[in-house]
């Protein structure tokens, strides 16, 4: 018989650097989860994605055990890294802060398509192109 789920919640944690301090410690502690066990498991699983904030879905069971599922970093973070810039613009209509090639956008699609709500590469390209547009990043050939 499957374990009974007590609660499911989401967090964004920097890859490889989960520690018991806020916001991780309080979020887990109030649910009765072993904080250090979570931190060690999360850091081990995400050590290859350093520099990104990783979305994680934590499932807590009634016996206070837990499982967690990591997702890919946010599309905006992947795009910023591919474009080689620190942050997007506050006014994407007037200000363009950088550009990204279609080849680099395809690399981002390869990483992110599992987490998007589509399996079609063309639709995924449109989703990520919209993200680029809203950040003030142009797509060039």
Swiss-Prot record:
GO molecular function: large ribosomal subunit rRNA binding; structural constituent of ribosome
Record family assignment: Belongs to the universal ribosomal protein uL11 family.
PROSITE patterns according to UniProt: RIBOSOMAL_L11
Quaternary structure note: Part of the ribosomal stalk of the 50S ribosomal subunit. Interacts with L10 and the large rRNA to form the base of the stalk. L10 forms an elongated spine to which L12 dimers bind in a sequential fashion forming a multimeric L10(L12)X complex.
NCBIfam families according to UniProt: L11_bact (TIGR01632)
InterPro entries: Ribosomal_uL11, Ribosomal_uL11_bac-typ, Ribosomal_uL11_C, Ribosomal_uL11_C_sf, Ribosomal_uL11_CS, Ribosomal_uL11_N, Ribosomal_uL11_N_sf
UniProt-listed Pfam families: Ribosomal_L11, Ribosomal_L11_N
Biological function: Forms part of the ribosomal stalk which helps the ribosome interact with GTP-bound translation factors.
GO cellular component, one term: cytosolic large ribosomal subunit
Processing and modification events after translation: One or more lysine residues are methylated.
This protein's record includes keyword rRNA-binding: yes
Keywords per UniProt: Methylation, Ribonucleoprotein, Ribosomal protein, RNA-binding, rRNA-binding
Biological process, per Gene Ontology: translation
Gene coding for it: rplK
Protein name: Large ribosomal subunit protein uL11
